[in-house]
Amino acid sequence: MNAITVLLKTEHIAAVCLLVFGLTRAGAQAAQAADHLPGYQAISMKDDLAHRSPDIHWPAGFEPEKADLFAHNDLIINASCERVWTHIIAAKRWPTWYPNSKDVEIQGGDPVLRDATVFRWTTFGLAIESKVHEYVLNQRLGWYGYAPGAEPTFYHSWYLEPEGTMCHVVMDEAGVGKDVASLRKSDETLMHRGHDLWLATLKWMAEQK
């Protein structure tokens, strides 16, 4: 039984999966249908800003309060932060468990992300390039996202904090620019929903024995 099969056994995660796939493959009609599934509650950017983590190190120009789009997600995972970290940095393997990612290629052929790593991948149906900006082993990972050859328009951050034998995983992302503002206008919660799916599948992977 694979990760996606297991995840679809819960209504909340099924809703998230349908929303992501509906938006990237079948359009807004599938997204609207998924919004009405039991257990799913839409989150606004205002809600995410109110709950954002004070522990994220934001680079200049990507402060959440100034962003055109922002998403905050967090989840407790019943595994050590060291174990969770190994799955986060193994970017080449993301497509095997996170369905909103594909075609991950790390510059230099390294299988994992490191400080200053540059990598290309496809997410939300968009081919992008990313560069690691912050790397603190087992605790912090942050990267810029941009169209190849263009200036950064997104900053994605992970923050891992031990809670006993478990790990509190925070994922915050901010975007700036006209295209980002247009995305917010058309679908403000798209990024939040995609990140819900990412954390849910990460939890499934990290908690496997």
PLM region spans:
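Bacterial N-terminal signal peptides that target proteins for export
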Residues: 2-14
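C-terminal segment of classical bacterial N-terminal signal peptides
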Residues: 21-29
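Hydrophobic ligand-binding cavity/cleft-lining segments
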Residues: 28-108
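Beta-strand/loop substructures that line and gate deep hydrophobic ligand-binding cavities in soluble
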Residues: 36, 146-204
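Hydrophobic/aromatic beta-strand elements that line small-molecule binding cavities or substrate pockets
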Residues: 73-75, 128-134, 145, 154-162
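A short, structured loop/turn motif at beta-sheet edges
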Residues: 78-82, 133-138, 159-168, 208-209
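Short beta-edge strand/loop motif at the mouth of beta-sheet-based domains
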Residues: 92-127, 138
